[in-house]
């Protein structure tokens, strides 16, 4: 009888802890979305798995390594701080990583691996939440289409994504959330046609 009561108490404690954690996570998400500084980053959409059976759009942001500017080489799983700036195209780029909190804006993430003066990590935002009915309207064919283009020399042909995808992110106190995904500068939820850019292309 005592064991059963103890089990129920422990179960209740677990539910309370999970509820409090979820409350804080949602609070951080809302705070970052509303008050965070906005930046644009390169992005791609992950169409694998049950794409339409979710309430979010899975996003890959290819910012995954930086020069290590900290003290000792970090261990896998260690929390680190990323410094960043805007490149010539106005997109956010990671300029360094450290175990010490930098002045100004920064991003918090964890180490995947480190070697030869570089640290590798996962970008700490990988989804944009959407209503299921919005998600079902997205044109997978349009957003995943690839085309063949001549390079700058005009001698070689390269296969690239037809649409130029980027994401708008908000950053606050090291936390990051994705607010929008853009296809050629327009929100993906408004991209339902196969017009794309005005380019001379050959379909791959």
Predicted regions mapped to residue ranges:
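N-terminal hydrophobic targeting signals that begin at the initiator methionine
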Residues: 1-3
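Hydrophobic membrane-insertion alpha-helices, especially the h-region
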Residues: 5-24
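Alpha-helical transmembrane signal-anchor/signal-peptide segments
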Residues: 28-44
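Extracytoplasmic
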Residues: 36-38, 56-58, 77-79, 162-164
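Short extracytoplasmic
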Residues: 41-70
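A mature extracytoplasmic/lumenal domain signature
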Residues: 45, 55, 63, 86-88, ...
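Short, compositionally biased
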Residues: 70-90, 98-100
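Extracytoplasmic/periplasmic terminal helices and flexible tails
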Residues: 83-85, 92-97, 108-204
């Amino acid at each position: 009888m005592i064991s059963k009561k103890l089990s129920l108490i422990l179960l209740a404690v677990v539910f309370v802890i999970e509820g409090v954690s979820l409350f804080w996570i949602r609070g951080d998400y809302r705070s970052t979305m509303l008050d965070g500084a906005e930046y644009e980053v390169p992005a791609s959409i992950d169409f694998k798995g049950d794409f339409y059976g979710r309430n979010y759009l899975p996003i890959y942001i290819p910012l995954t390594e930086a020069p290590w500017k900290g003290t000792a080489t970090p261990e896998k799983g260690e929390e680190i701080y990323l410094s960043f700036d805007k490149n010539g195209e106005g997109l956010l780029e990671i300029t360094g990583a450290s175990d010490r909190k930098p002045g100004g804006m920064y991003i918090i993430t964890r180490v995947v691996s480190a070697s030869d003066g570089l640290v590798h990590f996962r970008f700490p935002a990988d989804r944009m939440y959407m209503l299921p009915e919005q998600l079902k309207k997205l044109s997978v064919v349009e957003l995943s289409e690839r085309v063949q283009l001549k390079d700058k020399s005009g001698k070689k042909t390269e296969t690239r994504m037809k649409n130029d995808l980027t994401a708008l992110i908000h950053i606050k106190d090291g936390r990051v959330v994705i607010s929008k995904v853009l296809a050629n500068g327009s929100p993906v939820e408004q991209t339902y046609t196969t017009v794309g850019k005005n380019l001379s292309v050959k379909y791959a």
